[in-house]
Amino acid sequence: MLTKTFTASVLACLGLFVAGATMAETIQMTIDGKHYPIELAENPDARNFAARLPMTLTFENFGSKERIAYPKPAIKVENTVRHFDIPQGTMTIYKPWGNIAVFLVDFPWNDDLTNLGKLTDEGLEALRTSGDKPVTFSQ
């Protein structure tokens, strides 16, 4: 039975590979020496963000709904994916300012945002309570 299950799993993975399916890339967010995975969105802007890593930023509260940080230079967005849901924990780029915004609560879609990826609940809580501590993103 185990051999059949293993064989089926391998064949399923090979089928995805042959069909050209891609697995979502994961990057790391580090706060106070603890690492939290972030699943990147599957779009060109998320890949461009990942290409700039490692990157260390300081986040601040922007109202009560998001934490924002300002990378230098600002992130340019070329291929915005429009009309996506923004559940809490979504990491985005705000096009007009080129800053990163992580949403602490569910938020309505906004054409000025492009999706970068999704933090885990544990990662979101770490960022929410990070104050002005450095936050490092890496491959």
Residue ranges and their predicted role:
Residues V81-F84:
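Short, surface-exposed secondary-structure edge patches
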Residues M1-V10:
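Bacterial N-terminal signal peptides that target proteins for export
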Residues Q88-T90:
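Loop/turn positions that initiate beta-strands
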Residues Q28, L116-Q139:
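Well-ordered alpha/beta subsegment
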Residues E25-Y70, A74-V77:
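N-terminal secretory signal peptides
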Residues A19-A21:
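N-terminal signal peptide c-region/cleavage motif recognized by signal peptidases
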Residues S9-F17:
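Bacterial N-terminal signal peptides
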Residues K95-E122:
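Beta-strand-rich cores of mature extracytoplasmic or soluble domains
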